[in-house]
Design a protein with these regions (language model features):
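Hydrophobic positions on the alpha1 helix immediately C-terminal to the Walker A/P-loop
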Residues: 174-178
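N-terminal "pre-motor" subdomain/linker immediately upstream of P-loop NTPase catalytic cores
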Residues: 1-166
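Conserved glycine(s) of the Walker
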Residues: 170
């Protein structure tokens, strides 16, 4: 694939930076491929001597590529730059976000988080499709009674509603749907 060809160019002792054309193309291609595969997350993880790219599809992580460390580090820097994160800081977790478009031209938001590991910086990108975010409460699994209770809680003039749950459980989707 073109991704493998782009990564091939990245082999050898050459150093890359976040604005290198090859790196820009690799990141763009990776995102488009993730959208095509209907991935919900993209993981870029350092190992002892190479980088691993994994996609979460239907809740399961699949290894997609192995890439040279120099390419992986430059990709991570490129994505951090786009997410307005501190590119230099690699020893502390960071969060950011990037808006981009699918091949069909629809806007998608990526939530970024980095985490230091023994072998370098791990980057996880969660893909948010605004089309998927706005649904109705019934399609989110709310019973009729729950819908009524939720409506009452979220339209009260004062108070606080705390929405918690594990990653991917639908917190953001529930809140977007409520605001709609």
């Amino acid at each position: 694939s073109s991704f493998e060809q782009l990564v091939e160019l990245g082999k050898g002792n050459r150093q890359f930076d976040a604005n290198d054309q090859h790196i820009i193309h690799i990141v763009d291609w990776l995102w488009q491929y993730a959208f095509d595969q209907r991935a919900s997350d993209i993981h870029i993880e350092p190992r002892r001597d190479l980088g691993i790219v994994r996609f979460r599809i239907d809740g399961v992580l699949h290894q997609v590529y192995q890439i040279p460390m120099a390419v992986m580090n430059a990709m991570t820097s490129r994505i951090k730059l786009l997410g307005r994160m501190d590119v230099i800081e690699k020893r502390r977790p960071q969060d950011g976000r990037v808006k981009t478009r699918t091949p069909a031209g629809q806007e998608v938001e990526l939530r970024l988080s980095t985490l230091p590991t023994a072998f370098g910086e791990k980057l996880v990108m969660r893909i948010f499709d605004p089309e998927v975010l706005v649904r109705d409460l019934r399609s989110l699994g709310f019973s009729s009674d729950d819908q009524v209770r939720w409506q009452q809680m979220t339209t009260t003039p004062n108070g606080i509603v705390l929405v918690t749950g594990p990653t991917g459980s639908g917190k953001t989707t529930t809140l977007y749907t409520t605001l709609k």
